[in-house]
Amino acid sequence: MARSLTWGCCPWCLTEEEKTAARIDQEINRILLEQKKQEREELKLLLLGPGESGKSTFIKQMRIIHGVGYSEEDRRAFRLLIYQNIFVSMQAMIDAMDRLQIPFSRPDSKQHASLVMTQDPYKVSTFEKPYAVAMQYLWRDAGIRACYERRREFHLLDSAVYYLSHLERISEDSYIPTAQDVLRSRMPTTGINEYCFSVKKTKLRIVDVGGQRSERRKWIHCFENVIALIYLASLSEYDQCLEENDQENRMEESLALFSTILELPWFKSTSVILFLNKTDILEDKIHTSHLATYFPSFQGPRRDAEAAKSFILDMYARVYASCAEPQDGGRKGSRARRFFAHFTCATDTQSVRSVFKDVRDSVLARYLDEINLL
């Protein structure tokens, strides 16, 4: 009968072969302990979701809540991006007015629109006064407002109404973006972006990948050693089409992407955190855009944001249930995948703070307990 290498016998009682095996055993144990220590020191969460679901905004919130925030110098660096967002938004509405055959209501609007259209948004370096005056005039035009109400029929940044409502402040020469201005800014994520921060002595690394379809092939090497998957989906996209393909409903595409991700082998035992984002936009548009028009199975009352939220959550929950597999008969080392869902408004710092605290207290505590590190 072979002697156990864990016996407390004296070293001279072991053969050379057993001494070698004992050294190897000790080295393996040392490596395993070091790996556990590293796991404890840094945990990785993968942030996924379709384009414009709010992933980058969520990362910005993590920086504000758990990181260094945005200094005046940091915020100043967002000026050009915010100017670009404003020009892109107004030009999108001017283009849409022509396509949707919506007339201007004010006598000088065409002249102001022509001026705005002469500017390349991606070459803006300052917000010159003539453009600011033109946009303020246009934003008061009933035709532009009617076009905005039909925004589901063309691509328009969610931040359009916010920025256009603050044109006077933003167009000032001394303008320095606020934290809220920064949160509302939009730049498509390309490639892989990571952000590290500490919560209760645990370092978290959130990995954000590009949401556009062309970026998804770059995801694969991010899948290893992920303790939880955060999936962001927009509640307000039920009546919108993809920017890449105007024949596909954005919410249906998001549901399909969610299903695809859940089926990937890397996530079979990874907890899933669903953030149904943009509650504020849903609550605004549900009064004029009926959910049942796009999802006929919705039988709830019209203009009821809570009923709409419940229905959309149920669609995602059913996708999750259809992808969930029974555990492998209690196989040692296997972890049960769990599903957590939260409604969020990624531009609301207090809302995100509260939701992420729930995530930390449930998902992270459970994970650390499973690897015996609590």
From Swiss-Prot:
GTP binds at residues 49-56, 183-189, 208-212, 277-280, 346. Mg(2+) binds at residues 56, 189. Expressed primarily in hematopoietic cells. Coexpressed with EDG6 at the same relative levels in all tissues examined, with the highest levels in adult spleen and lung. GO terms for biological process: calcium-mediated signaling; G protein-coupled receptor signaling pathway; phospholipase C-activating G protein-coupled receptor signaling pathway. Residues 41-374 form the G-alpha domain. InterPro entries: Gprotein_alpha_Q, Gprotein_alpha_su, GproteinA_insert, P-loop_NTPase. G proteins are composed of 3 units; alpha, beta and gamma. The alpha chain contains the guanine nucleotide binding site. This is Guanine nucleotide-binding protein subunit alpha-15. The lineage of its organism: Eukaryota, Metazoa, Chordata, Craniata, Vertebrata.
